[in-house]
Curated annotation (Swiss-Prot):
Pathway: tRNA modification; tRNA-queuosine biosynthesis
Annotated protein name in UniProt: S-adenosylmethionine:tRNA ribosyltransferase-isomerase
Protein family according to the UniProt entry: Belongs to the QueA family.
Organism the protein comes from: Histophilus somni (strain 2336)
One GO CC term on file: cytoplasm
Catalytic function, reaction form: 7-aminomethyl-7-carbaguanosine(34) in tRNA + S-adenosyl-L-methionine = epoxyqueuosine(34) in tRNA + adenine + L-methionine + 2 H(+)
Pfam families noted in UniProt: Queuosine_synth
Subunit and partners: Monomer.
S-adenosyl-L-methionine found in the keyword field: yes
GO biological process: queuosine biosynthetic process; tRNA wobble guanine modification
EC class name: transferase
Its job: Transfers and isomerizes the ribose moiety from AdoMet to the 7-aminomethyl group of 7-deazaguanine (preQ1-tRNA) to give epoxyqueuosine (oQ-tRNA).
Record-level Gene Ontology MF annotations: S-adenosylmethionine:tRNA ribosyltransferase-isomerase activity
Length: 356
């Protein structure tokens, strides 16, 4: 298939710049992947669509305040976006500057928050293609602690506004636990504590994977034949208790429901790993990078239903949804969403999809 197959026209005013006041009050488009039927709902209705004994898979990553502003020692302005934390004092980052810093360039970051001349000193150690390896000059404080002081929430480029204090809470799921993401697993933003309690009381089971969403999730696909696209790698953890929960759910004939495309990619990576290693199980514990790319024609080994937001035209995420629900059903659903003025992208509305 071609990149242009996944294009749709999206009016700019349908891009959500701010979240709804109440998390679960967003709209939700229900799509039956088997016949293409559509139902217009509110997200809180999701409790009516999930049955006792079903298993919800959440991604418990926590978004870190990964964007920093500062200057090079020479005086030039610089913007740094953390992509991956390597250890307490080293990290990989994207850098925006009029001229890319050379090896051993000294940077001073966070002066916008700490005051002029008080920036945190960092050293550019090496370049790895599009990423820069940076190191804290002062090893007495860990990077994550420094980010809490000088970092900004890394809102996606299409939100097109500076981050605000409210984003520290709203661009974060209520069940976040493991710091490391530079973008939110946005399907999870719709769940509030009240809805989670309601689902638990109904007998719905929960399991938590960790996938640290990288900035690469916003990188455009640059090839016309989608099979030629090379996915960025992201770190995934699918522990034994998640594997056990999935196998127990399947054994009872209940459904495994992924909250977000990152949960899909985590679980399906663990299933692909099991298959490639000739495991007797449907999936195995998985602690590694994944660059799994799911597009029409690829099979789903585990996931039965998907909760997800509306994604960018020509993105790998709309390709994943098309693989799950069927290409034509997906594009018809998106057409209906535009016509009915659903809100799109990270702070937008949601879909509940059953597999084709």
């Amino acid at each position: 298939m071609y990149l242009s197959d996944f294009y749709f026209d999206l009016p700019d005013e349908l891009i959500a710049r701010y979240p709804k006041r109440e998390r679960s009050s967003s709209r939700m488009l229900q799509l039956n992947g088997q016949n293409g039927e559509l139902f217009h709902r509110t997200f809180s209705d999701v409790a009516d669509l999930i049955n006792e004994g079903d298993l919800l898979i959440f991604n418990n990553t926590r978004v870190i305040p990964a964007r920093m502003f500062g200057r090079k020692a020479s005086g030039g302005k610089i913007e740094v976006l953390v992509e991956r934390v390597l250890n307490e004092h080293h990290f990989l980052a994207h850098i925006r500057s009029s001229k890319s810093p050379k090896e051993n360039t000294v940077l001073f970051l966070g002066e916008d928050k700490l005051g002029e001349g008080k920036g945190v000193e960092m050293l550019m150690k090496a370049r790895h293609e599009n990423l820069f390896e940076l190191e804290l000059s002062d090893k007495s404080t860990a990077l994550l602690d420094i980010l809490q002081k000088i970092g900004h929430m890394p809102l996606p480029p299409y939100i097109d506004r500076p981050d605000e204090d409210a984003d520290k809470e709203r661009y974060q799921t209520v069940y976040n636990k493991v710091p490391g993401a530079v973008a939110a697993p946005t399907a999870g933003l719709h769940f509030d504590d009240e809805l989670l309690t309601q689902l638990k009381n109904k007998g719905v089971n929960f399991a938590f994977v960790t996938l640290h969403v990288g900035a690469g999730t916003f990188q455009p696909v640059r090839v016309e034949n989608i099979e030629d696209h090379k996915m960025h790698a992201e770190y995934v953890e699918v522990p034994q208790e998640v594997v056990d929960a999935v196998l127990a759910t399947k054994a009872k004939g209940k459904r495994v429901i992924a909250v977000g495309t990152t949960s899909v990619r985590s679980i399906e990576s663990a299933a692909l790993f099991a298959e490639e290693n000739n495991s007797t199980h449907l999936l195995e514990p998985y602690f590694s990078d994944t660059s799994i790319f799911i597009y029409p024609g690829k099979k789903f080994r585990v996931i039965d239903c998907l909760i997800t937001n509306f994604h960018l035209p020509e993105s790998t995420l709309i390709m994943l949804v098309s693989a799950f629900a069927g290409y034509q059903h997906t594009m018809n659903a998106y057409k209906s969403a535009v016509e009915n003025r659903y809100r799109f992208f990270s702070y937008g509305d949601a879909m509940f999809i059953t597999k084709a």
